[in-house]
């Protein structure tokens, strides 16, 4: 298994990531095509990366990371869309991605990795706790623009 950063767009990679995001979705619904421009923005940004875990020539997991900055926090890493293929869960791919995420955050000079996890996701919450993450008591808000 190898973990790399996305460095170029291809329709095949975009489709596989779309399949993985369906596995992540609570509803199991396909949210549609991921635009090529999104991939290009990630590839060209020094503050964002998409980590890809591959095994046997197939993408088995992804993690999308960003650096967030503020005067009170300085620099933190933020994790969005971390998923492994449901057919291979429990085989270490998520753990390998997790370690690579922590390394990525350290390389960027971040103090911590922050993320959200839905209330009904017991397996994901257990994974995070088993890997040293702690629940931080806060409310997460969203406002559509």
Residue ranges, per PLM feature:
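Conserved hydrophobic beta-strand within the GNAT/NAT acetyltransferase core sheet
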Residues: 79-82, 113-117
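Conserved active-site alpha-helix within GNAT-family acetyltransferase domains
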Residues: 95, 107, 119-143
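A cytosolic small-molecule/anion-sensing beta-strand core signal
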Residues: 55, 80, 86
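Acetyl-CoA-dependent GNAT
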Residues: 2-74, 99-100, 144
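Conserved acetyl-CoA-binding loop-helix of GNAT-fold acetyltransferases
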Residues: 84, 90-103, 130
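A conserved beta-turn-beta hairpin within the catalytic core of GNAT-like acetyltransferases
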Residues: 68-79, 89, 136-137
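Conserved GNAT acetyl-CoA-binding A-motif
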Residues: 98, 105-116
